[in-house]
Amino acid sequence: MKEKTGKPQAFSRHLIGKSASEHLANFNQLLAGMMGSAENKPEALKDITAVEVSQANFPALISAAMLGEFGAEVIKVEPPEGDPARKVSQYGVKVKGAGIPFLMESRNKHYITLDLQSEKGRENFKKLASRADVIIDGLKPGFMDSEGIGYRQFSKLHPGLIYVAISPYGHFTSKARNFRNIPDTDLTAQAESGYPALIGNPQAPEPYNYPLKAGVWAASYMSATLATAGTLTALLHKRRTGEGQMVDMASSEAISIWQGFSIAWGFTFEMPRVRVGNFDWCLFPYGYYQAKDGFVTVAAASDADFRGLLKILGRWDLENDWRFLFDRITDDVDKLKVLEGEFKKELIKFARKDLVRKTLSYSAGAAKSKLRGKGFPIIVETLSPREVLQEEHWQVRNSFLEADSGLKGRLKIPSSAPKMSESPPRTKRLECGIGQDNDKIYEKYGLLK
């Protein structure tokens, strides 16, 4: 394939040509300017009011914080003694009167106290709901309805309201009824999803072959993200029709869906997908490997990528034994371990940055080649949390914010992941005192003191 127009040509999924580097450099510079400061830029949800009422429900806390980042006025309703989630923290450390997990999800929120089991508290909540666009209910299923302030009541009084309920099992199954008093925890949500059964070393003997949970609150963040997506979709529907609706989010369902094809695998092949550890059922190599000074991530999605990886490592001799796709993609773990052992012997000889440099050099040459099938293997460094915080790349993207912790040093917390040119998310405040905004919100919404 020749360059007839003088413009960069595309081979596979890569841009090549003499002007490609200049083009990408200019484009990067343009985007860097567009994705910079959020100052003086509009907020996408500026006209939206969301009321969050939850106790010890981190998916609800996280979802409400996401709406707040995009400009919604988020009012966090707590009982007079505060949300029990405030007490969750490593080593009992409190920042600004709350545990770090709670503080992180306090972005841009207003905090008020209401006793929903009192007549005055319920009347005040009704006043809030009458002017709200969204309610996020993170209490036990059925509690709000039993107090006369749930979706069933508000759908008649306020038909445009979007009512988002987040709980372990949702609201409308027999299990949801039977387990309604079980608190929402990330651990139980993972357990009910089948996900922990897929994690761990497949070769581990008894008693080490037990299920493993993800090292982060995966179910909480996944269910919060999906609940937020449901909320935004419901807002679009309301814009077209004027109709509100209920969004029912079950946290265990969220992480079940997150597994993707793992669930479908059992139905398709009439066999469960078992744990494969550092292997993958569809790709090989596709995992973490020891280098001279740490770990690297190695991925070769296609045969061409695999051959490119062999060339980078100087092990072209292996191609004769493993040249076909199904020689590498197999559920025979013992067979995979043979090839993995060869990779381990080579990767341990190199420093991480040297492996990355060699891979980038190979990919640059492959992109310029007029021959298809050169392959683009991937080798990147596997980073520790400390290394992530030190990465210049994430600093340029403003991926982490610094906040006054009241302790020695400043607190670093994750910022919003999507970078947007016209209506970017932002963190304007990080305060979460119990009832700190009572006076302001009570006056604004005409609540009874």
Label every model-predicted segment.
Residues 235-277:
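Substrate-binding/catalytic subdomain of NAD(P)-dependent oxidoreductase enzymes
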Residues 81, 168-170, 251-256, 293, ...:
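Glycine-rich beta-alpha junction loops
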Residues 2-243, 433, 437-449:
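N-terminal helix-loop segment corresponding to the beta1-alpha1 unit
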Residues 372-424:
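A glycine-rich dinucleotide-binding beta-alpha-beta segment and adjacent secondary-structure elements
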Residues 211-222, 244-246, 276-277, 284-286, ...:
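A short glycine-threonine-serine/GTX helix/turn-capping micro-motif
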Residues 33-36, 291-294, 351-354, 364, ...:
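An anion-binding loop in the catalytic cleft
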Residues 285-286, 290-374:
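Aromatic-enriched alpha-helical interface/lid elements that frame and gate functional surfaces
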